[in-house]
């Protein structure tokens, strides 16, 4: 099992766009078959190093690659490129 973890820091003044991005990202659950579970969360502490996190679980690294290249994921991801100042990701075996 693979856990795919992504964190974002958003530009100031982009709160509405960030909320739209996170809402659409969460909506991918159930739409892309290879996603086993996922959680999209905002930081509980204002001013944290990162503003939001995605934690998804997949059976294999191949499933992670399929997810990353799925047109629905690509479309949602494109919403984030202009509003983020930083993004970090890691895939770990669980």
Which residues fall in each region the model found?
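Charge-dense polyanion-binding interfaces
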Residues: 81-94
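Sterically constrained small-residue positions within well-ordered secondary structures
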Residues: 45-47, 80-83
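Short, flexible helix/strand-to-coil boundary loops that buttress conserved ligand/catalytic motifs
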Residues: 68, 77-80
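Short S/T/G/P-rich N-terminal loop/turn motif that feeds into the first structured element of a domain
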Residues: 1-52, 59-69, 92-94
């Amino acid at each position: 099992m693979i856990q795919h973890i992504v964190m974002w820091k958003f530009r100031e003044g982009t709160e509405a766009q960030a909320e739209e991005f996170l809402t659409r990202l969460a909506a991918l659950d159930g739409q892309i078959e290879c996603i086993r579970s996922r959680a999209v969360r905002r930081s509980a502490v204002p001013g944290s190093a990162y503003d939001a996190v995605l934690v998804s679980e997949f059976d294999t690294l191949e499933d992670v690659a399929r997810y990353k290249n799925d047109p629905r994921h690509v479309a949602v991801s494109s919403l984030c490129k202009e509003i983020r100042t930083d993004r970090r990701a890691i895939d770990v075996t669980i």
